Design a protein with these regions (language model features):
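Second-shell loop/turn segments in exported
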Residues: 62-66
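Bacterial N-terminal signal peptides that target proteins for export
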Residues: 2-17
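C-terminal segment of classical bacterial N-terminal signal peptides
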Residues: 19-28
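Extracytoplasmic entry segments of secretory-pathway proteins
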Residues: 12, 28-31
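SH3-family beta-barrel domains
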Residues: 31-60, 71-75, 82-85, 89-97, ...
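Short amphipathic alpha-helical segments with coiled-coil-like heptad repeat character
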Residues: 2, 67-68, 99
């Protein structure tokens, strides 16, 4: 009877060791994806969001007691989140200017900033497709889909595909719909 209990205990111990060893080999592979995640939201860092409000205070640190350095005054402006702390997100704009903004002022709606003057929107993701509209540099457009080298934009009642390389607010390898 003693030997039977010892065998069961040994088999259980062996199984537990195998599980621990497997986990130790699997975990580094997951960690090596190169994508950092926020400690608050567990979402990728950096990531793009947009201004939900038409005006938002940008603070030096993540609390109301920190000084306001400036005010973002453009609804739907794309911003890149670079850090998280409680209800605060450290963001930066296209020019690298930024600070801490309360999360309630931000939206997950994807927008981009046009970086090329008279950027043409095409009917299909093809440079030879019919041109639907042209957007001036600095225009903010909503993004509904991105794949490969093109993104589907909506702005001023127009809809069309634009080359991803001419936009700020999406990563080069990013795809979504």
């Amino acid at each position: 009877m003693y030997k039977t209990k010892l065998r069961k205990f040994g088999a259980g111990l062996l199984g537990a060791c195998a599980l621990i060893l497997t986990a130790s080999f699997v975990t580094p592979a997951i960690a090596d994806t190169g994508e950092e995640t926020g400690k608050v939201t567990n979402r990728p860092i950096p990531r793009f969001v947009s201004m939900k409000a038409s005006e938002g205070n940008v603070r030096r640190g993540p609390s109301l007691t920190h000084r306001i350095d400036w005010v973002f005054k453009r609804r739907d402006m794309p911003l890149r989140i670079t850090a998280e702390h409680g209800h605060w997100r450290r963001v930066e704009d296209r020019d690298g200017m930024g600070g801490w903004v309360h999360y309630s002022l931000l939206s997950g709606t994807r927008t981009v900033l046009v970086e090329k003057d008279m950027l043409t929107l095409h009917a299909r993701p093809d440079p030879n497709a019919p041109v639907m509209a042209a957007l001036e540099m600095g225009v903010v457009a909503r993004v509904s889909e991105c794949g490969g080298e093109w993104c589907l934009l909506r702005s001023g009642g127009f809809k069309g595909w634009a080359p991803k390389a001419r936009l700020w607010g999406v990563r080069p390898s990013e795809t979504f719909d």
